[in-house]
Amino acid sequence: MASTKVQPNYGYCETFFVESYEDTDGVFAKAAAERERARAIAKVQQKHMAANLSRLTSELYLNDVLDHMEVMEAETMPDINSIEIQTEIQWFMRPYLLDFLLEAHHAFQLLPETLFLAVNLLDRYCSKRVVYKRHYQLVGCASLLIAAKYGDRKERVPTIKELKSMCCSLYDDDMFTQMEWHVLQTLNWIIGHPTVTGFLEIALSETAADAEVQNMATYISEMALYHKDFIPVLPSVMARSSLALARYILGRPQVHHPEWAARYDSNVVM
């Protein structure tokens, strides 16, 4: 007697472990679409809640954050007079090194604040140690490496091999590691320096978004890195001055910042 194989007919079940042979009514497709829609709505709600919490928290602690940033920026400024007495490195060499750092910063797609922090670490190290001309670029690479590790995404941090290649193999691998360690020890592991970009973000958060003003202010701040006269200028003052100049260049009206600008002399800023 020949046996007949009966095709099983499972009913609809909302599980990933049971499959039916047919979906003539499109039930599964509708359920999957509904799940994706629910996930998308949940993500939007989460982002909205996070933005509100971030805004409320920033408003609550803004003054405390600014106070801490001002203390830190004063404690982590380089001494231009100490750099002046360097025997081998001269001021005309600094723009060439900054060109190199800016190129490396762009090549590795690092955050804007990483560049400002790297230059701060470089100048602070040169304020405390005698730097030979042949090691000047090495100090710059070590400063960029430390700054990237401190505030950038892990996958963007340059490797020693990449830095060595950019330096045309002028330094051995272990020299980068040794210089990185020496910079950290010299600065007593105090890396956190409030950069111009940090103060720019705070100032811009108090006004309507304007990408052109932000980009222009950042560009002005980057250009100021090349001039030694701006080395002693506090990042907070530089940020406000860059914003004021950017608005003037772009023909934007000057904005009054009641909470933040009141801390500074308007004559210094403008």
Put a short name on every predicted segment.
Residues 1-138, 145-202, 215-223, 249:
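Acidic, Ser/Thr/Pro-rich regulatory low-complexity segments at or just upstream of the first helical elements
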Residues 3-5, 10, 224-240, 244-270:
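C-terminal region detector
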Residues 141-147, 239-243:
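Acidic, metal-ligating active-site segments
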Residues 164-177, 208-209, 261-270:
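Short, mixed-charge aromatic SLiMs
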Residues 200-201, 212-216, 230, 237:
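Alpha-helical scaffolds that organize eukaryotic protein assemblies
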Residues 205:
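A glycine-rich beta-turn/hairpin centered on an aromatic-Pro dipeptide
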